[in-house]
Amino acid sequence: IDPANAAIAVQGMGNVGGTAAEIFYKNGQKVVAVSDYTGGLYCEDGLDIPAIRKFISEGNTLDKYEQDGVQHVTNDGLITCKCDVLIPAALENQITEDNAGRIQAKLIIEAANGPTSVEADDILNSRGIIVCPDILSNAGGVVVSYFEWVQNIQNLTWDLDEVNKMLQKIMLTAFNKVYAL
């Protein structure tokens, strides 16, 4: 998957999903689908994530969002939409044996706790779809908490860029070790 051209779908626009969608958008990547508990939005050409985040921050839900070229989809529709990368960042058991055969993503990054059932995981594996497990995908917060602890006990101060570089190094090393399994 070429990150620069990857179509990304994010289920859940809370702290994890919303932030992930915003980071992808700011990095110039195409976020084609997002959702909240009321349903989702899909646009093959990419969504305006800052506008959607502003809309949500004003107390609105995605079922009320309107923009030319944007289609409303169900949460299951988001899970099975045309995309390269799928990030379930909402609830557990969103990818099941009922929808795993219809998933079009080549890579799934589990940002929610337990979003994929065991049966679905077997189906995805048999189809060659890579799943980055939640225990790895969620580890970034724990790693940064460790960095905060180290800074406090050693009276250090690291800027955000330094923290992000250290986090990226640790997470990439962990991912590569898991992927090699």
Go through the PLM ranges and name each one.
Residues 1-80:
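Glycine-rich phosphate/diphosphate-binding loop of Rossmann-like nucleotide-binding domains
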Residues 101-181:
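Adenosine-phosphate binding glycine-rich loop
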